[in-house]
Amino acid sequence: MPRIDDAALHEAALAHLARFSATEAGLRRVLSNRIRRWARAAGQAGQDPEAIAAEVARATAAAAAVAARMVRAGAVDDAAFAAARARRLRGAGRSGRATLAHLAQKGVAAELAAAALQGEEVPDEFHACLVACRRRRIGPFAAAAPGPDTRRKWLGTLARAGFGGEVARRALDTPRAEAEARLA
């Protein structure tokens, strides 16, 4: 079974970045998965476990170096990734909390994620809450006026989506025409 050399890792990184935007941590994870698959195949091919472990350690260090090289080259930019993803998620009705959690899961540093949420082009929390209401057909976008139990369920739905109580109440109380105008 051939070794995983730096060139193969570099090519794998380029192939991934050609198809997907990624963070440095995400790229390291992709390369790590490739190394893990190689190690599993090498073990099944009957290679010495000690030799496999040594190769995995060397390839893991090389993967970190490849990811760092991609950052230096500008192919990976965590701040740009965070800004674009925050804009997309908030525009789709995700709360600030849900967006921060998503960015953290993707490997974006907390300060970069917070800065991305403050960007000019990122919709505010109220706008995102109205989008969530429209997607779920609740609040101003409901077919009928809610009873007290229904309103409580809607508040619970928005709370589970990460919206604060004040923002959720304000969105649910917004008249339909005003909500549609805000989203237009």
Regions found by a protein language model. Give the residues of each.
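An alpha-helical, amphipathic repeat domain used for nucleic-acid recognition
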Residues: 1-184
